[in-house]
């Protein structure tokens, strides 16, 4: 299959796509009405008291040649992130064992590459096989993939491949110049053709407007089928990156984005991802009420802070929520 960027979303067209217009209308609703609609949809497809738990490990950190304006792992920015080589298999599997013992259902592995070299992909495939043998779901994010590379990961048993769109087609060029939006869609098509589930979302708070948020969610929702997993990130502004001086996003705006994602992609897992450390327990509770049902679990998320496991467990207890087993 191929995924082409619709010309109606590739430029700032006067008439937005029906999906985009519908999502823009959702984002403009009074918050109580929006959350009510999102929770109603959520209950039709999921147990609203359960949260899917994923853990993310950086298996190759820093030195990425891409110029993503938000990313401390880009070689374009001097932020003190030391580039590392791809990890050996044994410590990755040990980290996966610890994650499973802590309650994680899915183990995600991220490498800061533009795209993987084939010899590195062989080692990643062995990691996938080892994590699968532990009884966990697997996800990797390695950059752009060729169709044969996606097929190699599928043969290793990979469950999910993460490749985010980041933002709307219109706003994308102000954040990233070293790969195109279509490059990202091509990787998603290769992953889908290989029979791997897609994990794909974006980042809120990079200076985009509400229409850009609607454009991101519409592009995701219009994928056929939509991603099985949709991570929604709040920008973590790292000093020294292009977006390092960005103001924090209003938590209510973040909740609105979660709710619109849930309504527009009713069967997808909607994950609270980067930036959750800055959200209060009350803001996270609103996100769960708005349809979020997945988190990254663990004290770090690649190179940024994440809520402590003890804090998450205490929050789940207070809310009467349980981890999906």
Curated annotation (Swiss-Prot):
Task: Relay the cofactor remark from the entry.
Answer: Binds 1 [4Fe-4S] cluster. The cluster is coordinated with 3 cysteines and an exchangeable S-adenosyl-L-methionine.
The residue ranges of the Radical SAM core domain are 49-267
Per UniProt, [2Fe-2S] cluster binds at: 108, 139, 199, 271
One Pfam annotation reads Radical_SAM
Q: Which cofactor does it need?
A: [4Fe-4S] cluster; [2Fe-2S] cluster
What function does this protein fulfil? Catalyzes the conversion of dethiobiotin (DTB) to biotin by the insertion of a sulfur atom into dethiobiotin via a radical-based mechanism.
Q: Which family does it belong to?
A: Belongs to the radical SAM superfamily. Biotin synthase family.
Protein name as it appears in the record: Biotin synthase
**Native source species:** Acidiphilium cryptum (strain JF-5)
| Gene from which the chain derives | bioB
């Amino acid at each position: 299959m191929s995924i082409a960027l619709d010309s109606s979303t590739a430029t700032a067209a006067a008439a937005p796509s029906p999906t985009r217009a519908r999502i823009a209308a959702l984002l403009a609703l009074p918050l109580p009405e929006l959350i009510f609609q999102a929770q109603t949809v959520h209950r039709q497809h999921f147990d609203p008291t359960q949260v899917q738990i994923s853990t993310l490990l950086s298996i190759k950190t820093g030195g990425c040649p891409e110029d993503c304006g938000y990313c401390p792992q880009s070689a374009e920015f001097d932020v003190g992130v030391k580039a590392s080589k791809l990890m050996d298999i044994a410590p990755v599997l040990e980290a996966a064992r610890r994650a499973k013992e802590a309650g994680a259902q899915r183990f995600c592995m991220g490498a800061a590459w533009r795209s993987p070299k084939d010899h590195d992909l062989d080692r990643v495939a062995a990691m996938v096989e080892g994590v699968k043998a532990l009884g966990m779901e697997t996800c990797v994010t390695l950059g752009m993939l060729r169709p044969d590379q996606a097929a190699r990961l599928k043969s290793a048993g990979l469950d999910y491949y993460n490749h985010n769109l980041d933002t709307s087609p219109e706003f994308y060029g102000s954040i990233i110049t070293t790969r195109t939006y279509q490059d990202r869609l091509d990787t998603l098509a290769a992953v889908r053709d290989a029979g791997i589930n897609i994990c794909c979302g974006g980042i809120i708070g990079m200076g985009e407007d509400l229409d850009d948020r609607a454009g991101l969610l519409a592009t995701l929702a219009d994928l056929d089928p939509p991603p099985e997993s949709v991570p929604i990130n709040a920008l973590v502004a790292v000093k020294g990156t292009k977006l390092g001086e960005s103001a924090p996003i209003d938590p209510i705006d973040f909740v609105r984005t979660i709710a619109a994602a849930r309504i527009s992609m009713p069967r997808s897992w909607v994950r609270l991802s980067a930036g959750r450390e800055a959200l209060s327990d009350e803001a996270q509770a609103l996100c769960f009420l708005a349809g979020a049902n997945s988190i990254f679990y663990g004290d770090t998320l690649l190179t940024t802070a994440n809520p402590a496991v003890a804090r998450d467990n205490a929050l789940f207890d207070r809310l009467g929520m349980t981890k999906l087993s």
